Amino acid sequence: KFENNMRAIRTLKTLEKEHRPASPEDQEVLSQYVGWGGIPQAFDERNAAWADENRELKYTLTPEEYEMARASTLNAHYTSPTVIRAIYSAVEQMGFHTGNILEPSCGVGNFFGLLPETMQNSRLYGVELDSITGRIAQYLYPQADIAVTGFEKTDRKDFFDLAIGNVPFGAYKVAD
């Protein structure tokens, strides 16, 4: 997971530096990013077994990106394709087929990537708080309008036909 994440981050930073869209090969690398929920030890400076990885993170990420990634180790667990398909199946059974779709905590955009054929004419909107993750989603799904910020800071209210996703659950306090 660590190496896939680092390859994706390096690819992201290259794309941004070169001001170009992601090629299919770039998107394949970006799609391997899984966040830091499964590997919090990479941020533990006292863990000698992960010292090299911690140094690489600090070298590659800005201080702000590093802190945001470290903070995400508690909640960056992406929804499995099986669960996403089941959610879409339920939505289709309720009669939804096209419209404005919001994913309020979109991660790298897995709900966009698994959008059923019957919903392909929909407009996609996402919000992602984590900077690296949101920027990867923007390159993976350039047709979607993805805001990289907290949902409470967006103007994305009273506009959607469907809000879908699996937002992190926890005792988080938000001031808006």
Regions picked out by a protein language model, each given a short descriptive name:
Residues 1-176:
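Class I S-adenosyl-L-methionine-dependent methyltransferase catalytic core
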